[in-house]
Amino acid sequence: MTIHAQEYWRQRFAADREQLEKRRQEGFAQGAKAAAAMRKRWSQIRAVHLFGSVLDDRFRSHSDLDLLVEGLPPAALLDAIALAEGAGPLPVDLKRQEDLSEDLVQRLLRKSQTL
């Protein structure tokens, strides 16, 4: 590979990493915005947690935003997903804490960030 090709690929990979980090940061902002909007709409929400690949090096361009919500009414699930997806560019995987086993909740909370 020529020196020009090496430099091209070095720059390309750096730009890709920069773009991915920008998208990850947008995910953080989306999570915070979604948490605030959900709390405003459903006052019974006790906690919103961000978990999954957005918090570590597994985040990729196709990654989604993983949210765990405690206290969201069951009938509000689809509205909450729509609200969270409207808060930013990432698709959202939203889980009601009450729908999960205690073991799974504890595993998710160990590697989560409260919003």
Where do the model's predicted regions map?
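Glycine-rich beta-strand-to-loop/alpha-helix junction loops that act as flexible
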Residues: 50-53
